Amino acid sequence: IVFRAAQERSDIEIVAINDLLDAEYMAYMLKYDSTHGRFNGTVEVKDGHLVVNGKTIRVTAEKDPANLKWNEVGVDVVAEATGIFLTDETARKHITAGAKKVVLTGPSKDATPMFVRGANFDKYAGQDIVSNASCTTNCLAPLAKVINDNFGIVEGLMTTVHATTATQKTVDGPSHKDWRGGRGASQNIIPSSTGAAKAVGKVIPELKGKLTGMAFRVPTPNVSVVDLTVRLEKPATYEEIKKAMKDAAEGSMKGVLGYVEDDVVSTDFNGEVLTSVFDAKAGIALNDNFVKLV
């Protein structure tokens, strides 16, 4: 997904990929995707490397990032997407190998700072290793920031209705740490834990200790929903909340936050480039201080 997204931008050039897959299989997986469809471009393999749209991309299969010799291909930024090297100590091996900066595609497991578009990008101070947090945090944080900035959040609970992920089982299987997580993904709605809401407190310090949440894993291949239920400091009608969200989507958070009033469903957002989309028709207010937002 990172690779496909990069192909849509003229200011990013992929020069190298490290994966334990061989180049032929890597090319196959790039060409064909059950969720996102065929790759819009040419893909071939030459001398053990990928050639995409005529550009050669170095392919390696190193288990230790310190051996990757990123300096040989002029790497500026590494997208660390294995889910394994999520601390400063382990991710710094990419710096040792010659990269200038590293972006972790999941939440860091130590004090490595997390930055989320629409929440705290303005706080970035040139750190060489950062985390982009989780997909759920990226969806929740812009929404929570708009609400907190305009009305104040006293406290809140989040539920994410989350699409199936690769870590789940196709049929029931052993899962010693998470028994429910071992049940068949296509057969069940599976309650699960998530640190996404608490992570919002790391990127928006004013919300630290005010949010927590849980997840339901559901049998859909892509697109997830965040349901945020909050108690507001400043009373607001649902129409006032909608206006604040629309103003942000068209103003300060344009390109990050979306606003929709159509009768949409999850597949309408397959391939969505915005971080978060507020569904104006899906939310509901109990009163002017207690609301559910989607």
From Swiss-Prot:
GO terms for cellular component: cytoplasm. The keyword NAD applies. Pfam families: Gp_dh_C, Gp_dh_N. The record marks 162 as: Activates thiol group during catalysis. D-glyceraldehyde 3-phosphate binds at residues 134-136, 165, 194-195, 217. NAD(+) binds at residues 19, 63, 105. InterPro entries: GlycerAld/Erythrose_P_DH, GlycerAld_3-P_DH_AS, GlycerAld_3-P_DH_cat, GlycerAld_3-P_DH_NAD(P)-bd, Glyceraldehyde-3-P_DH_1, NAD(P)-bd_dom_sf. One of its GO terms (molecular function) is NADP binding. CDD domains: GAPDH_I_C, GAPDH_I_N. Homotetramer. This is Glyceraldehyde-3-phosphate dehydrogenase. It comes from Serratia marcescens.
